[in-house]
């Protein structure tokens, strides 16, 4: 019975409206345009911004330029014809006519211009044919379709090609991004002003942009001035974000058309959906009694009086302002979630209005997250690796849900007697994936049994969040999939961090933003770092003839190989089972231990190793400690530019000496120059009256690894009093790999006429640091018992400290020259120089000499001319132990006191550490000596033997 009463009431309203709109008099009807004064033709143009037209009405034609969307005013009803004029470079659309009548005062016409492809360049050479434009058509809405301000319009379009992007706009509103597919796409636009609403869709593909337009008839919503209109609060409307999903909010409302209860017109069935607490307002005359109820029915029609009386009272008040507000807590009737309820407004007990609402406070069905691999060269996945329950991933990984047919759950209980279709939740919207790092695993909220509260907890601690997925996709096995990236090679965002274990959760969402967290999660760990080679090194361990300056780069003769191991990065998946580590050098597989580098030709080599990966395929990230080495078993070369061979000099004369050294391997390290009075002598006696040992007078080191070095120096020629004979200038060159060469050039030194006597020697002593000197007279010989014996401490692997630091002090040294003849009343020659020297340990020098002459494996190398090398060394290395200069003091006085400090290790030691007596002795001094010389070139010497 209640349905008949409602139908009668509705019929009455239509009848009254009809009676009010039609008259029966004979008054002449005025022109509709003159009455409305709003007639116009809207000209919509696509492809160009403006065009020229001939406009014809009532037989009169006018030419004018019209812009896209321009309204052409018309004074009266009738037919208007617009004929486009030709436009260079574009097709010319056909003419169109439209009729303005009382039922259509503001018609619109559409003209589409397309680019005409070029067929040549005008010079007979042809031309470049541009890419043909694609087509883009709006299929919904159509031109002239009705629309309402404030209500979104779903715009659907098709494209002849797959679009890379598309935007939509209506009027002058901001463009919004459209959802695109291979054949078109869709978007939502909302008109804000009434009138002709020009909708423009602009798509981009293959570097071209094409637009399509339609015009809809936008009208303001019909305002129901009757009292009792229920309006939800505008600031609580659940609008869409730029990601195409509804915004997050605990409370809000949204108009949705589900189209369930009226199959004949599903698009017209729009309900207000609410979640949480929503504020409403209702208009009423001041002083009216306003009652607001929440009622339920068994169908889709309005409630009966019995339904209203059985409903919940939301508000009952005497209106004072004309507008009353009330709040609806949609959770109060949770068992009726998803079921239509009615807000009933009763004014003064008689006037009744109705507003249907549907509460939805529950999320959709739970998704089930799963993982699988991505097909690219740098990605890999190991599910449940070694039964650990943990999935290891390299590069990108695909996350999807194993239950693709997700729906919004129908939590509500339909009223007694109603059909199943009464249950209408807001509907499924999207899925998003969240990665929670291991640092948050202890968060107790993640164990929340309420799936919606658990979703909030997951969102609060997740550090990697995917974009929302609104469509399941075409591959059913991986529905609602998203790719998570990791590692430097991946171009995917977002990216997970290496060596962090994550829980992968999925959260489903409905159209109101209610979210449901997955009941399960996947454990995943990302690893994009390969193994590391540790403890592997090859280094020069041959100290003969001298030590390498870069023992892990420059190798000569014997090297020692240490083969380390391989370890995966901390927290990584681990090594690839069954792979072993092998090394090669110059194509030879090398083993741990000593290696004679003379087996290979000189040159740079890279230490190779086999292709190793971890279990995910990550390659080795570090090479051996010294991945590249240089084998250098070739002696450097050195030549004298000055002095001239067999050149003659007077004692005391300054001799200019220049040597040029070069090395084609690791480069020159240092050059030393010596003077010597004996040649071809290999015993270690200190002869008198001459010294008989090479005595250093110049030295130069090269710090930049240069291949060549030139040393310029001067030597004050020395000779015994009244003596004459050969003096040998020697150059010792050492390269950075420890190879050495000696070159010799002889000169002749004759005693100056005033060189008649040696300088007189004072006391001398070499002693331990912080001890006292004990001077005794010296002669031109080396004494082992002169003063306190110098006994170094080398026990217990002693470091080079003050115990091994020595002082040598010489007291007053007096000139021995006397005036000559009756005419010379003053001393004409003076003391010129006092120098301190340490003698290279004789035992070790003999080892070096023997190595160069006999035991060096290079003498048996297939890569050198062994005979020539042996002859060259035989001529140059047969010399006594050299005296190494510790310091000197030039003076023009007739007497000189000197004080020089040294340590036991000689300066050929080159900075290596030592751990036993032999290493200390290898580069040590076995004597500390001094030389005093005068301006006439005479000299005296003295010294003290080191007691070991």
UniProtKB/Swiss-Prot annotation:
Protein's GO biological process: cell wall organization
Cellular component, GO, one term: S-layer
Post-translational modification summary for this protein: Glycosylated. Contains tightly bound reducing sugars (six per polypeptide chain) and fatty acids (covalently bound and located in the N-terminal region).
Compartment annotation: Secreted, Cell wall, S-layer
Leader peptide range in chain numbering: 1-17
Keywords (A to Z) from UniProt: Cell wall, Cell wall biogenesis/degradation, Disulfide bond, Glycoprotein, Lipoprotein, S-layer, Secreted, Signal
Cystine connections: 168-187, 554-666
PROSITE patterns documented for this protein: PROKAR_LIPOPROTEIN (PS51257)
Function in brief: Shape maintenance, possible protection from noxious enzymes or exogenous and unsettling DNA, and may mediate homotypic cell-cell contacts.
Other facts noted in the record for this chain: The hydrophilic C-terminal region rich in aromatic AA could be engaged in interactions with nucleic acids, and the bound fatty acids and the N-terminal region could serve to anchor the layer to the outer membrane of D.radiodurans. HPI layer contain about 30% beta structure and virtually no alpha helix.
Protein's recorded name: Hexagonally packed intermediate-layer surface protein
Organism this protein belongs to: Deinococcus radiodurans (strain ATCC 13939 / DSM 20539 / JCM 16871 / CCUG 27074 / LMG 4051 / NBRC 15346 / NCIMB 9279 / VKM B-1422 / R1)
